[in-house]
Amino acid sequence: MSNTTLHATTIYAVRHNGKAAMAGDGQVTLGQQVIMKQTARKVRRLYEGKVLAGFAGSVADAFTLFEKFETKLQQFSGNLERAAVELAQEWRGDKQLRQLEAMLIVMDKDAILVVSGTGEVIAPDDDLIAIGSGGNYALSAGRALKRHASHLSAEEMAYESLKVAADICVFTNDNIVVETL
């Protein structure tokens, strides 16, 4: 990414005890030194509120991908996996889309997927995943919570995992938005 690209964030998603939750922070960073916004909303409800999507990367690029993904959801009657695969194929195959600098996590009540511009659609083995600059911190915290604090709800796990990432990663803030299914 260029030095003037708006980027950096953390998105975390988990399925736990029959519930699903996705959390994202609110920080938008310009380059490596300037916080441009602290209250961005990077987790959205799509397809009549039945699908959650979160992005890490360039904001403008992510909005383009949200629109394309929602179109694919409509086209395939809400089939998350099919819509994600079709988006990844289009993203990888289109010369202009290939330039987009973002990653998505998409989820419904049954599945979590990471979608990237390299054509990858990845389902995590353990019903939790994180992307973005603080993704490894959130993922580590989430795995620990799932193993040792399984009494927490999916929403609580998502919030606390993002909170840990915000405490460590300078590109992640603690203005956390959590959406649940």
Curated annotation (Swiss-Prot):
The keyword Metal-binding applies. One of its GO terms (molecular function) is threonine-type endopeptidase activity. Keywords: Allosteric enzyme, Cytoplasm, Hydrolase, Metal-binding, Protease, Sodium, Threonine protease. Its main location: cytoplasm. InterPro entries: ATP-dep_Prtase_HsIV_su, Ntn_hydrolases_N, Proteasome_sua/b, Proteasome_suB-type. It is found in: Cytoplasm. The keyword Acyltransferase does not apply. It is an enzyme of class 3 (hydrolase). Belongs to the peptidase T1B family. HslV subfamily. This is ATP-dependent protease subunit HslV. It comes from Staphylococcus aureus (strain Mu50 / ATCC 700699).
